[in-house]
Amino acid sequence: MKNEQVTIVATGAVIGLLAAILVFFGNPANMGLCIACFLRDTAGGLGLHAAKAVQYIRPEISGLVLGALAAAYLHGEFAPKGGSSPLTRFVLGFFAMIGCLMFLGCPFRMLLRIAGGDLNAIVGLVGFAAGIYAGIFFLNRGYSLKRTYKMTAAEGSIMSVIAVVLLVLLVAAPAFIHFTKAGGGPGAKHAAVAVSLGAALVVGYLTQRTRFCMIAGLRDFVLFRETKMLWGFVAVVAAAAATNIVLASVTGGAFFKLGFAAQPIAHTDALWNVLGLFLAGFACVLLGGCPMRQLVLSGEGNSDSAVTLLGFIVGAAFAHNFGLASSGNGPTANGQIAVVIGIAVVTAIAYLNTYKK
């Protein structure tokens, strides 16, 4: 157990370090790795939404999937399976993304924002924890999306093939792929493809080996008083914060800024930061893992996680096509309505799939 905890802490430190370094090499501030934002950008790059500021096929997405695939194959853990309420998972993924884009980041970016000095993310953490507690309430009463079934290797490999196709499209850059113009928004800020892909391959490999998951830390602490994953989260924040502070002192860049106001790609509306991550946390508990974990599981051959990723992508497209996503100016009225609807829908799904009412 002690060795496992050391491995998880080391993994968290490496991930935090790499995420901060990716910002140095060009990724948006406090966004070295953000699954929600990167899926949103990729959806834009494929033309699924028309928000020109956030259009770029992020190689980190492919890297996480392929890194997890490599780890699973090397350690005999590639196990294609699926068939556990896929449409329900799609809907949960959709609304988890709506919650993330209300907050402006997935649970992992929440940690990176804290490491960059953004105190709004600590406010969001309150909502995230509350959402996890809401999910645990139903888990303790028999919530289940029922069993999975063994699938073929071809089925389990589909998401990995898609990851390779996305890389080809990024490098080939055909005319039908969209890219944010320089200076046009977060989509224009990115590290070199090789740097992004290399870092993500490492993160994908490590997270597959350690089962690193933003949901598991709090969930397992509440259910089993298990703390090893929580220490992994602390390691992410500590490593990213230390790297940010060093980079700021050496380069003079704005890698660390303590406060609420004028934080990069963030807003200061506390209520909707809380509610956005409440929705994301609640939905992800019901899904069995955070967005990063879903990417890793899809690399292992889990088609249910692949369907969840499709829900994330469609949610991102809806968020930007219909004005649901927040901006630095704050949440939109449409987004607020969508989050309230999402909380109601996720609660209904939790209740209807709980069998010891």
State the predicted function of each range.
Residues 1-357:
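Membrane-interfacial helix-loop segments of redox and metal-homeostasis proteins
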